[in-house]
Amino acid sequence: MSYNPYDNVLATVENAANILGYKPAEYEAVKYPERELSVSVPVRMDDGSVKVFKGYRVQHSTVRGPAKGGIRYHQNVNLDEVKALSAWMTFKCAVADIPYGGGKGGVVVDPTTLSDGEKQRLTRRFTSMISPIIGPDKDIPAPDVGTNAEVMGWIMDTYSMLNGHSTPAVVTGKPIALGGSEGRNEATGRGIMLNTLYICQKLGIDIKAATVTIQGMGNVGSVTAKLLNKEGAKIVAVSDVSGGIYNGNGLNIHAILEYLSVKGNLLSGYNEDGMKRISNEELLTLDTTILIPAALENQINKDNADKIKAKVIVEGANGPTTIEADEILDKKGVVLVPDILANSGGVIVSYFEWVQNLQSFEWTEEEVNSKLARKMSKAFENVYGIAKEKNVSLRTGAYLIALKSVVDTTKLRGIWP
Protein backbone atom coordinates (compact mmCIF):
# COMPACT_ATOMS: atom_id res chain seq x y z
CA MET A 1 0.00 0.00 0.00
CA SER A 2 1.46 3.36 -1.01
CA TYR A 3 2.00 6.11 1.54
CA ASN A 4 -0.43 9.05 1.31
CA PRO A 5 1.02 12.22 2.87
CA TYR A 6 -2.46 13.73 3.27
CA ASP A 7 -3.34 10.92 5.72
CA ASN A 8 -0.39 12.18 7.78
CA VAL A 9 -1.96 15.66 7.89
CA LEU A 10 -5.39 14.33 8.89
CA ALA A 11 -3.96 12.17 11.69
CA THR A 12 -2.00 15.11 13.11
CA VAL A 13 -5.05 17.41 12.95
CA GLU A 14 -7.25 14.79 14.68
CA ASN A 15 -4.67 14.37 17.44
CA ALA A 16 -4.44 18.14 18.05
CA ALA A 17 -8.25 18.50 17.96
CA ASN A 18 -8.65 15.77 20.58
CA ILE A 19 -6.13 17.43 22.93
CA LEU A 20 -7.88 20.80 22.46
CA GLY A 21 -11.25 19.16 23.15
CA TYR A 22 -12.83 20.31 19.88
CA LYS A 23 -16.10 18.87 18.62
CA PRO A 24 -15.95 17.61 14.99
CA ALA A 25 -18.06 20.53 13.74
CA GLU A 26 -15.45 23.01 15.01
CA TYR A 27 -12.62 21.72 12.82
CA GLU A 28 -14.36 19.70 10.08
CA ALA A 29 -13.68 22.34 7.40
CA VAL A 30 -9.93 22.26 8.16
CA LYS A 31 -9.75 18.63 7.02
CA TYR A 32 -10.59 19.47 3.39
CA PRO A 33 -8.88 21.80 0.89
CA GLU A 34 -11.10 24.70 -0.19
CA ARG A 35 -10.13 24.36 -3.84
CA GLU A 36 -8.24 21.87 -6.02
CA LEU A 37 -7.36 22.89 -9.58
CA SER A 38 -5.95 20.32 -12.04
CA VAL A 39 -4.71 21.51 -15.43
CA SER A 40 -3.21 19.91 -18.54
CA VAL A 41 -0.40 22.13 -19.78
CA PRO A 42 0.57 21.84 -23.49
CA VAL A 43 4.12 22.95 -24.25
CA ARG A 44 5.88 23.19 -27.62
CA MET A 45 9.27 21.54 -27.18
CA ASP A 46 12.49 22.62 -28.87
CA ASP A 47 12.18 19.83 -31.47
CA GLY A 48 8.73 21.09 -32.55
CA SER A 49 6.76 18.36 -30.78
CA VAL A 50 4.05 19.16 -28.22
CA LYS A 51 4.10 17.58 -24.76
CA VAL A 52 1.28 17.87 -22.23
CA PHE A 53 2.22 18.14 -18.54
CA LYS A 54 -0.12 17.67 -15.58
CA GLY A 55 -0.24 20.61 -13.16
CA TYR A 56 -2.00 21.40 -9.89
CA ARG A 57 -2.78 24.33 -7.61
CA VAL A 58 -4.46 23.56 -4.29
CA GLN A 59 -5.75 26.16 -1.83
CA HIS A 60 -6.20 24.45 1.51
CA SER A 61 -7.44 27.43 3.51
CA THR A 62 -7.95 31.17 3.07
CA VAL A 63 -9.55 31.71 6.48
CA ARG A 64 -6.55 33.62 7.89
CA GLY A 65 -5.63 35.40 4.64
CA PRO A 66 -4.64 34.72 1.02
CA ALA A 67 -3.33 31.23 0.25
CA LYS A 68 0.48 31.04 0.32
CA GLY A 69 2.81 28.33 -0.87
CA GLY A 70 5.35 27.17 -3.40
CA ILE A 71 5.21 25.69 -6.87
CA ARG A 72 7.36 22.62 -7.41
CA TYR A 73 8.56 20.99 -10.62
CA HIS A 74 9.24 17.30 -9.94
CA GLN A 75 8.49 14.03 -11.69
CA ASN A 76 6.81 12.59 -8.57
CA VAL A 77 4.33 15.45 -8.01
CA ASN A 78 0.79 14.16 -7.43
CA LEU A 79 -2.47 15.61 -6.11
CA ASP A 80 -2.30 14.00 -2.65
CA GLU A 81 1.22 15.38 -2.14
CA VAL A 82 0.14 18.88 -3.22
CA LYS A 83 -2.91 18.71 -0.91
CA ALA A 84 -0.69 17.73 2.03
CA LEU A 85 1.84 20.46 1.26
CA SER A 86 -0.94 23.07 1.03
CA ALA A 87 -2.31 22.01 4.43
CA TRP A 88 1.17 22.19 5.98
CA MET A 89 1.39 25.76 4.66
CA THR A 90 -1.88 26.67 6.42
CA PHE A 91 -0.47 25.45 9.73
CA LYS A 92 3.02 26.85 9.10
CA CYS A 93 1.63 30.36 8.53
CA ALA A 94 -0.50 30.05 11.67
CA VAL A 95 2.48 28.96 13.82
CA ALA A 96 4.55 31.85 12.43
CA ASP A 97 1.58 34.19 13.04
CA ILE A 98 1.57 35.71 9.56
CA PRO A 99 -1.75 36.61 7.84
CA TYR A 100 -1.87 33.84 5.25
CA GLY A 101 -3.67 30.59 4.59
CA GLY A 102 -2.10 27.64 2.82
CA GLY A 103 -1.66 26.81 -0.85
CA LYS A 104 0.67 24.72 -3.00
CA GLY A 105 1.22 23.95 -6.65
CA GLY A 106 3.19 21.62 -8.82
CA VAL A 107 3.83 20.29 -12.29
CA VAL A 108 4.68 16.65 -13.00
CA VAL A 109 8.00 17.14 -14.80
CA ASP A 110 11.70 16.47 -14.31
CA PRO A 111 13.02 20.04 -14.78
CA THR A 112 16.55 18.78 -15.50
CA THR A 113 15.26 17.36 -18.81
CA LEU A 114 13.99 20.77 -20.02
CA SER A 115 15.94 23.47 -21.85
CA ASP A 116 15.63 27.00 -20.45
CA GLY A 117 13.22 27.85 -23.27
CA GLU A 118 11.04 24.80 -22.59
CA LYS A 119 10.97 25.56 -18.87
CA GLN A 120 9.96 29.15 -19.56
CA ARG A 121 7.18 28.12 -21.97
CA LEU A 122 5.90 25.55 -19.44
CA THR A 123 5.94 28.14 -16.65
CA ARG A 124 4.12 30.80 -18.67
CA ARG A 125 1.41 28.42 -19.92
CA PHE A 126 0.92 26.94 -16.42
CA THR A 127 0.68 30.48 -14.98
CA SER A 128 -1.96 31.46 -17.54
CA MET A 129 -4.02 28.39 -16.58
CA ILE A 130 -3.93 29.06 -12.82
CA SER A 131 -4.09 32.87 -13.14
CA PRO A 132 -7.85 33.12 -12.38
CA ILE A 133 -7.25 31.83 -8.84
CA ILE A 134 -3.94 33.51 -7.94
CA GLY A 135 -3.16 37.15 -7.14
CA PRO A 136 -1.72 39.35 -4.36
CA ASP A 137 -4.95 39.13 -2.34
CA LYS A 138 -5.96 35.58 -3.42
CA ASP A 139 -3.01 33.19 -3.60
CA ILE A 140 0.70 34.04 -3.72
CA PRO A 141 3.05 31.34 -5.12
CA ALA A 142 6.76 31.03 -4.27
CA PRO A 143 9.73 28.80 -5.24
CA ASP A 144 9.87 25.17 -4.16
CA VAL A 145 11.64 21.99 -5.28
CA GLY A 146 12.72 22.40 -8.92
CA THR A 147 11.82 26.09 -9.19
CA ASN A 148 13.72 29.27 -8.32
CA ALA A 149 13.74 33.08 -8.49
CA GLU A 150 13.99 33.01 -12.30
CA VAL A 151 10.79 30.92 -12.54
CA MET A 152 9.04 33.34 -10.16
CA GLY A 153 10.07 36.20 -12.46
CA TRP A 154 8.37 34.45 -15.41
CA ILE A 155 5.22 33.88 -13.34
CA MET A 156 5.15 37.54 -12.27
CA ASP A 157 5.66 38.77 -15.84
CA THR A 158 2.99 36.44 -17.29
CA TYR A 159 0.44 37.40 -14.64
CA SER A 160 1.26 41.10 -15.13
CA MET A 161 0.83 40.83 -18.93
CA LEU A 162 -2.53 39.06 -18.50
CA ASN A 163 -3.74 41.81 -16.15
CA GLY A 164 -2.35 44.81 -18.02
CA HIS A 165 -0.16 46.18 -15.23
CA SER A 166 2.94 45.17 -13.28
CA THR A 167 1.98 43.08 -10.23
CA PRO A 168 5.14 42.16 -8.30
CA ALA A 169 3.18 41.03 -5.20
CA VAL A 170 1.65 38.06 -7.08
CA VAL A 171 4.69 35.91 -6.20
CA THR A 172 7.51 35.97 -3.67
CA GLY A 173 11.05 34.67 -3.98
CA LYS A 174 11.56 36.85 -7.09
CA PRO A 175 14.89 38.28 -8.26
CA ILE A 176 15.77 41.48 -6.33
CA ALA A 177 15.48 43.53 -9.55
CA LEU A 178 11.83 42.47 -9.94
CA GLY A 179 10.82 43.36 -6.40
CA GLY A 180 12.34 40.45 -4.51
CA SER A 181 13.42 40.91 -0.91
CA GLU A 182 16.93 41.03 0.45
CA GLY A 183 17.49 37.93 2.59
CA ARG A 184 14.79 35.83 0.88
CA ASN A 185 17.20 33.42 -0.80
CA GLU A 186 18.73 32.39 2.54
CA ALA A 187 15.56 32.71 4.64
CA THR A 188 14.53 29.04 4.93
CA GLY A 189 18.06 27.90 5.76
CA ARG A 190 18.50 30.80 8.20
CA GLY A 191 15.28 29.80 9.95
CA ILE A 192 16.52 26.21 10.29
CA MET A 193 19.84 27.46 11.67
CA LEU A 194 18.02 29.65 14.22
CA ASN A 195 15.73 26.80 15.32
CA THR A 196 18.77 24.53 15.67
CA LEU A 197 20.44 27.09 17.95
CA TYR A 198 17.23 27.60 19.96
CA ILE A 199 16.70 23.88 20.63
CA CYS A 200 20.38 23.34 21.47
CA GLN A 201 20.14 26.17 23.99
CA LYS A 202 17.07 24.56 25.62
CA LEU A 203 18.77 21.14 25.78
CA GLY A 204 22.13 22.46 26.99
CA ILE A 205 23.96 21.38 23.81
CA ASP A 206 27.01 23.46 22.85
CA ILE A 207 26.67 23.99 19.09
CA LYS A 208 30.47 24.19 18.76
CA ALA A 209 30.75 20.67 20.21
CA ALA A 210 27.86 19.28 18.14
CA THR A 211 28.08 17.12 15.03
CA VAL A 212 25.54 17.75 12.27
CA THR A 213 24.36 15.69 9.28
CA ILE A 214 22.29 17.24 6.50
CA GLN A 215 20.29 15.27 3.93
CA GLY A 216 19.75 17.42 0.84
CA MET A 217 22.09 20.11 -0.49
CA GLY A 218 19.68 22.22 -2.52
CA ASN A 219 19.04 25.83 -1.51
CA VAL A 220 17.73 24.89 1.95
CA GLY A 221 20.40 22.35 2.88
CA SER A 222 23.34 24.33 1.51
CA VAL A 223 22.34 27.58 3.24
CA THR A 224 21.76 25.68 6.50
CA ALA A 225 25.19 24.05 6.16
CA LYS A 226 26.87 27.40 5.48
CA LEU A 227 25.23 29.17 8.43
CA LEU A 228 25.69 26.34 10.96
CA ASN A 229 29.32 26.00 9.87
CA LYS A 230 29.69 29.74 10.57
CA GLU A 231 28.23 29.16 14.07
CA GLY A 232 30.99 26.61 14.74
CA ALA A 233 29.06 23.35 14.30
CA LYS A 234 31.00 20.40 12.89
CA ILE A 235 29.15 19.17 9.79
CA VAL A 236 30.22 15.56 9.30
CA ALA A 237 27.92 14.42 6.48
CA VAL A 238 25.87 15.90 3.63
CA SER A 239 24.06 14.36 0.67
CA ASP A 240 22.18 15.10 -2.54
CA VAL A 241 20.39 12.97 -5.16
CA SER A 242 23.72 11.39 -6.17
CA GLY A 243 24.51 10.12 -2.65
CA GLY A 244 26.33 11.36 0.42
CA ILE A 245 29.79 12.05 1.81
CA TYR A 246 31.06 11.63 5.38
CA ASN A 247 34.08 12.84 7.33
CA GLY A 248 34.08 12.27 11.10
CA ASN A 249 36.50 15.18 11.56
CA GLY A 250 34.17 17.58 9.76
CA LEU A 251 33.70 18.33 6.08
CA ASN A 252 35.13 21.36 4.28
CA ILE A 253 31.76 23.09 3.81
CA HIS A 254 33.23 26.11 2.04
CA ALA A 255 34.85 23.86 -0.61
CA ILE A 256 31.68 21.77 -1.00
CA LEU A 257 29.47 24.83 -1.53
CA GLU A 258 31.94 26.28 -4.03
CA TYR A 259 31.91 22.97 -5.93
CA LEU A 260 28.11 22.69 -5.91
CA SER A 261 27.70 26.29 -7.10
CA VAL A 262 28.85 25.17 -10.57
CA LYS A 263 25.73 24.23 -12.55
CA GLY A 264 25.31 20.48 -12.93
CA ASN A 265 27.82 19.51 -10.23
CA LEU A 266 26.69 16.78 -7.82
CA LEU A 267 28.36 15.44 -4.68
CA SER A 268 29.21 12.18 -6.48
CA GLY A 269 31.97 14.13 -8.25
CA TYR A 270 33.36 15.85 -5.13
CA ASN A 271 36.50 14.72 -3.30
CA GLU A 272 38.40 15.80 -0.20
CA ASP A 273 40.96 14.14 2.09
CA GLY A 274 39.52 11.87 4.78
CA MET A 275 36.00 11.61 3.36
CA LYS A 276 34.11 8.47 2.45
CA ARG A 277 31.05 7.97 0.28
CA ILE A 278 27.78 6.93 1.91
CA SER A 279 24.19 6.50 0.75
CA ASN A 280 21.30 8.79 1.69
CA GLU A 281 19.96 5.94 3.82
CA GLU A 282 23.28 5.57 5.70
CA LEU A 283 23.41 9.32 6.34
CA LEU A 284 20.08 9.22 8.21
CA THR A 285 21.36 6.60 10.68
CA LEU A 286 24.78 8.09 11.50
CA ASP A 287 25.72 8.61 15.15
CA THR A 288 25.38 12.40 15.28
CA THR A 289 24.08 15.15 17.56
CA ILE A 290 21.77 16.83 15.05
CA LEU A 291 20.12 15.42 11.92
CA ILE A 292 18.59 17.83 9.42
CA PRO A 293 16.49 16.14 6.71
CA ALA A 294 16.27 18.84 4.01
CA ALA A 295 15.33 16.77 0.96
CA LEU A 296 11.87 15.33 0.27
CA GLU A 297 8.90 13.85 2.18
CA ASN A 298 8.77 10.47 3.91
CA GLN A 299 12.55 10.05 4.38
CA ILE A 300 12.26 8.99 8.03
CA ASN A 301 9.72 6.18 8.26
CA LYS A 302 8.83 3.07 10.25
CA ASP A 303 11.59 1.11 8.46
CA ASN A 304 14.51 3.31 9.53
CA ALA A 305 13.29 5.36 12.54
CA ASP A 306 14.53 2.77 15.02
CA LYS A 307 18.05 2.98 13.55
CA ILE A 308 18.35 6.75 13.93
CA LYS A 309 21.01 7.73 16.48
CA ALA A 310 20.70 11.54 16.36
CA LYS A 311 19.70 13.25 19.61
CA VAL A 312 17.92 16.09 17.79
CA ILE A 313 16.13 16.24 14.43
CA VAL A 314 15.36 19.61 12.84
CA GLU A 315 13.06 19.16 9.85
CA GLY A 316 14.30 21.22 6.91
CA ALA A 317 12.03 19.55 4.34
CA ASN A 318 8.24 19.44 4.43
CA GLY A 319 6.90 16.17 5.86
CA PRO A 320 10.19 14.23 6.02
CA THR A 321 8.94 12.12 8.96
CA THR A 322 5.90 9.83 8.86
CA ILE A 323 3.41 9.48 11.73
CA GLU A 324 4.71 5.96 12.52
CA ALA A 325 8.30 7.22 12.62
CA ASP A 326 7.24 10.09 14.89
CA GLU A 327 5.95 7.63 17.48
CA ILE A 328 9.14 5.53 17.34
CA LEU A 329 11.38 8.62 17.69
CA ASP A 330 9.25 9.93 20.56
CA LYS A 331 9.67 6.66 22.48
CA LYS A 332 13.42 6.79 21.86
CA GLY A 333 13.57 10.29 23.36
CA VAL A 334 14.68 12.00 20.15
CA VAL A 335 13.76 15.71 20.25
CA LEU A 336 12.25 16.77 16.93
CA VAL A 337 11.68 20.36 15.78
CA PRO A 338 8.81 20.01 13.26
CA ASP A 339 8.77 21.31 9.70
CA ILE A 340 5.92 23.78 10.26
CA LEU A 341 8.16 25.58 12.76
CA ALA A 342 11.71 24.75 11.64
CA ASN A 343 11.46 25.70 7.96
CA SER A 344 9.03 28.61 8.27
CA GLY A 345 11.80 31.17 7.68
CA GLY A 346 11.06 31.07 3.95
CA VAL A 347 7.39 31.97 4.27
CA ILE A 348 8.10 34.58 6.96
CA VAL A 349 10.48 36.45 4.63
CA SER A 350 8.05 35.85 1.74
CA TYR A 351 5.53 37.75 3.87
CA PHE A 352 8.10 40.54 4.32
CA GLU A 353 8.62 40.61 0.51
CA TRP A 354 4.85 40.81 -0.12
CA VAL A 355 4.50 43.66 2.40
CA GLN A 356 7.39 45.55 0.77
CA ASN A 357 5.79 45.08 -2.69
CA LEU A 358 2.37 46.30 -1.53
CA GLN A 359 3.92 49.36 0.14
CA SER A 360 6.51 50.00 -2.62
CA PHE A 361 9.13 49.94 0.12
CA GLU A 362 12.52 48.26 0.59
CA TRP A 363 14.20 46.86 3.70
CA THR A 364 17.92 46.10 4.00
CA GLU A 365 19.15 42.53 4.49
CA GLU A 366 20.04 43.39 8.10
CA GLU A 367 16.48 44.61 8.74
CA VAL A 368 14.99 41.49 7.14
CA ASN A 369 17.25 39.12 9.12
CA SER A 370 16.53 40.98 12.36
CA LYS A 371 12.75 40.84 11.80
CA LEU A 372 13.02 37.15 10.87
CA ALA A 373 14.94 36.33 14.07
CA ARG A 374 12.29 38.11 16.18
CA LYS A 375 9.40 36.28 14.48
CA MET A 376 11.19 32.94 14.63
CA SER A 377 12.19 33.29 18.28
CA LYS A 378 8.60 34.13 19.27
CA ALA A 379 7.19 31.18 17.30
CA PHE A 380 9.75 28.78 18.82
CA GLU A 381 9.09 29.96 22.38
CA ASN A 382 5.31 29.63 21.85
CA VAL A 383 5.65 26.06 20.57
CA TYR A 384 8.22 25.03 23.19
CA GLY A 385 6.10 26.56 25.95
CA ILE A 386 2.85 24.78 25.05
CA ALA A 387 4.68 21.48 24.44
CA LYS A 388 6.12 21.68 27.98
CA GLU A 389 2.79 22.78 29.47
CA LYS A 390 0.79 19.95 27.83
CA ASN A 391 3.64 17.40 28.06
CA VAL A 392 3.52 16.70 24.31
CA SER A 393 6.05 16.67 21.46
CA LEU A 394 7.09 19.89 19.74
CA ARG A 395 5.17 18.77 16.64
CA THR A 396 1.97 18.34 18.62
CA GLY A 397 2.63 21.67 20.35
CA ALA A 398 2.99 23.39 16.97
CA TYR A 399 -0.27 21.87 15.71
CA LEU A 400 -2.11 22.88 18.89
CA ILE A 401 -1.14 26.51 18.24
CA ALA A 402 -1.87 26.29 14.49
CA LEU A 403 -5.22 24.52 14.74
CA LYS A 404 -6.43 26.83 17.52
CA SER A 405 -5.53 29.87 15.40
CA VAL A 406 -7.40 28.55 12.32
CA VAL A 407 -10.44 27.39 14.34
CA ASP A 408 -10.62 30.67 16.32
CA THR A 409 -10.50 32.69 13.08
CA THR A 410 -13.19 30.48 11.52
CA LYS A 411 -15.44 31.07 14.54
CA LEU A 412 -14.95 34.84 14.28
CA ARG A 413 -15.71 34.86 10.55
CA GLY A 414 -18.53 32.33 10.71
CA ILE A 415 -19.51 30.06 7.83
CA TRP A 416 -21.26 31.91 4.99
CA PRO A 417 -24.19 31.95 4.25
State where each predicted segment sits.
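Short, Gly/Pro- and small/polar-rich lid/capping loops
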Residues: 2-40
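Rossmann-like adenosine-cofactor binding region
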Residues: 243-336
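Glycine-rich, N-terminal phosphate-binding loop and its surrounding beta-alpha-beta segment
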Residues: 39-47, 52-111
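Glycine/serine-rich phosphate-binding loop and adjoining beta1-alpha1 elements at the start
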Residues: 74, 94-208
